[in-house]
């Protein structure tokens, strides 16, 4: 009870795309997947100060193409491209195939879920109050165009002995609307009291397709007529004897007990 489905996995092939895009047979699939996980962990440690949001790995025809989304591309590239060349050579050793590295800039890091989660965990490790860090991140995201944001922190918050979970939400975050563009990410803060987990949901509006098609406004449904409404607007005239009473009798008027004599007997 109370558990939420992973927003990215729920929307795969509907409004989200995979982070690893390649095909493999049954023999190579596990090894290639493990290789992707190792590459992402290596890049996360290597580019810890570069504010990396996500890494997309593609494998076209015995090559590898890695796209790094970062809010600080200058840190990744380095002076005269030295750092990125070293990074490319290290990745080629790990993957065993020619590697092409592309850098994409994140224009609004305040609305990127992974960067928000990493920022909060870094503040928690510096002993900043978790409520202050969460609310500041929510205010920045809403100010820069997010339609809704929800942040959850779990663990020994403020060093208390009993772990608990606290979450805050601003705006709307429709988790079960498939066309809703929900950016979801997690991060962990390693504090002296233990690990504090942070989850972030950011609602950026509705999309059609895989984050590239615009939203088409829904056409308002025509008002359906009532079942007893007639084209002319007037009700059908009532026929004599309809409704169970004598002709011309008003609804609710008392019925006479007998026939014409009114004594309850007939034919006498």
From Swiss-Prot:
GO terms for cellular component: cytosolic small ribosomal subunit. GO terms for molecular function: mRNA binding; rRNA binding; structural constituent of ribosome. Residues 258-268 have a biased composition (Gly residues). Keywords: Ribonucleoprotein, Ribosomal protein, RNA-binding, rRNA-binding. The keyword Mitochondrion does not apply. Residues 232-242 have a biased composition (Basic and acidic residues). GO terms for biological process: translation. Coiled coil: none annotated. It comes from the Bacteria. Residues 39-107 form the KH type-2 domain. Residues 216-268 are annotated as: Disordered. Residues 248-257 have a biased composition (Low complexity). Pfam families: KH_2, Ribosomal_S3_C. Disulfide bonds: none annotated. InterPro entries: KH_dom (IPR004087), KH_dom-like_a/b (IPR015946), KH_dom_type_2 (IPR004044), KH_sf_prok-type (IPR009019), Ribosomal_S3_C_sf (IPR036419), Ribosomal_uS3_bac-typ (IPR005704), Ribosomal_uS3_C (IPR001351), Ribosomal_uS3_CS (IPR018280). Part of the 30S ribosomal subunit. Forms a tight complex with proteins S10 and S14. Binds the lower part of the 30S subunit head. Binds mRNA in the 70S ribosome, positioning it for translation. Belongs to the universal ribosomal protein uS3 family. This is Small ribosomal subunit protein uS3. It comes from Paraburkholderia phytofirmans (strain DSM 17436 / LMG 22146 / PsJN).
């Amino acid at each position: 009870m109370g558990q939420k489905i992973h927003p990215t996995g729920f929307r795969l092939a509907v409004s989200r795309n995979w982070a690893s895009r390649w095909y493999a047979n049954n023999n190579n699939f596990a090894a290639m997947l493990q290789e992707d996980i190792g590459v992402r962990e290596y890049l996360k440690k290597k580019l810890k100060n570069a504010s990396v949001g996500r890494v997309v790995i593609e494998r076209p025809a015995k090559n590898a193409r890695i796209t790094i989304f970062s809010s600080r591309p200058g840190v990744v590239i380095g002076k005269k491209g030295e750092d990125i060349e070293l990074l490319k050579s290290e990745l080629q050793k790990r993957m065993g195939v020619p590697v092409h590295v592309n850098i994409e800039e994140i224009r609004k890091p305040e609305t990127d879920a992974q960067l928000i989660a990493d920022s909060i965990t870094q503040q928690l490790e510096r002993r900043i109050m978790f409520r202050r860090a969460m609310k500041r991140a929510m205010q920045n995201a809403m100010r820069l165009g997010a339609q809704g944001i929800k942040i959850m922190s779990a663990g020994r918050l403020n060093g208390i002995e009993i772990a608990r979970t606290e979450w805050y939400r601003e705006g709307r975050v429709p988790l079960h609307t498939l066309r809703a563009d929900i950016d979801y990410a997690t991060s962990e803060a390693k504090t002296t009291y233990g690990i504090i987990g942070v989850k972030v949901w950011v609602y950026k509006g509705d999309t059609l397709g895989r984050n590239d098609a615009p939203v088409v406004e829904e056409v308002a449904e025509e008002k359906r007529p009532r079942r007893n409404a007639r084209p002319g607007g007037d009700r059908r005239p009532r026929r004599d004897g309809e409704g169970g009473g004598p002709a011309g009798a008003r609804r609710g008027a008392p019925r006479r007990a007998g026939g014409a004599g009114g004594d309850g007997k007939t034919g006498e």
